[in-house]
Amino acid sequence: KTVNQYGWGTDRRTKKNRTRAGVARMKRKRSESRTEQDVPILVRIKAIKSEHPLWGYRRIWAYMRYREGLVIGKNRVYRLMGENNLLVTKNLRLKAKRYSTRAKPRASVPNQYWGMDMTKIRLSSWGWIYVHCVLDWCTKEIIGYYVSTSSKTLDWLTALEMAVSTRFPDGIHQKKGKPKLITDNGCQPTSQAFIKACSQLGIKQIFTTWNNPKGNADTERVFRTLKEDLVWTNDWNLPFEFQLDFETWINDYNTDFPHQSLSYKTPQQMMQTFINRNQKKEAQKNNESSLILA
């Protein structure tokens, strides 16, 4: 028991119940002005949700806050989505049972680690098509891709050559720090033609192990985002129809997709941050050298 200033004792349970009752009395009905302010926000949330059905409240809040410039709290977005049944529920049956034996590589600068993989997509009137992507693990930008009706070594090399021409127009051998390409142990990346091409391009290969589910996690996560945003909500009859929408999606992903791991920056914003940082360092070096010569 606790004794108050009058000498009366009060047990802890009674004190706890009184506190709960006081909190309940303090809760008031939301004002009409506040409710009116929620209307345009809810309209915008529903519009974003219609375009991206599997986006959660954090990503929707980040898009509204950092891409559209709306000053809004994360809890407010969570409340509005919860009141209108717009939240994404977790499927506990899909929880992974494997555990990684070692951590995945962490990229600290662009072009340090690239990830490459393939996924297949079924078209209703055509059959299977194969999507190959190359991802920069630092900026999360898709820098190379190729869509085909097969998944041969040449298809993989086409996507890889696009990535090289995007980031190294003058060739990798003329740049410092050659990228490391992370792939699985499939027949395409382990073929002699692919290994020889990587050696000629100046790319070092890293192969994931069978007992390391996080070995190429960043690249596989991009395919999940692709299927959530584009594949599962649309249907195509012919490959070229998918190709057009896929290229539009890649442009939107690189320029307009906020990433939590990038402090809600887009991939191209993250790349521009490193470019500005390098330019600032070079300017400082030039100033120091000019002062020494003077």
Residue ranges and their predicted role:
Residues 2-113, 266-278:
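Basic, flexible linker segments flanking DNA-binding modules
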Residues 1, 5, 45, 60, ...:
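Mobile genetic element proteins and their domesticated derivatives, centered on retroelements
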Residues 37, 41, 53-57, 73, ...:
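Hydrophobic (often cysteine-bearing) scaffold residues that line and stabilize catalytic clefts
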Residues 31-32, 199-203, 225-294:
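C-terminal domain-tail junction helix/linker
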Residues 63, 80-84, 163, 193, ...:
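Alpha-helical structural signal in soluble globular domains
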Residues 91-95, 178-185, 199-218, 234-239:
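RNase H-like polynucleotidyl transferase catalytic core
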Residues 145-146:
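Short hydrophobic alpha-helix segments
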Residues 39-50, 70-135, 141, 154-162, ...:
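Mobile-element integrase/transposase regions
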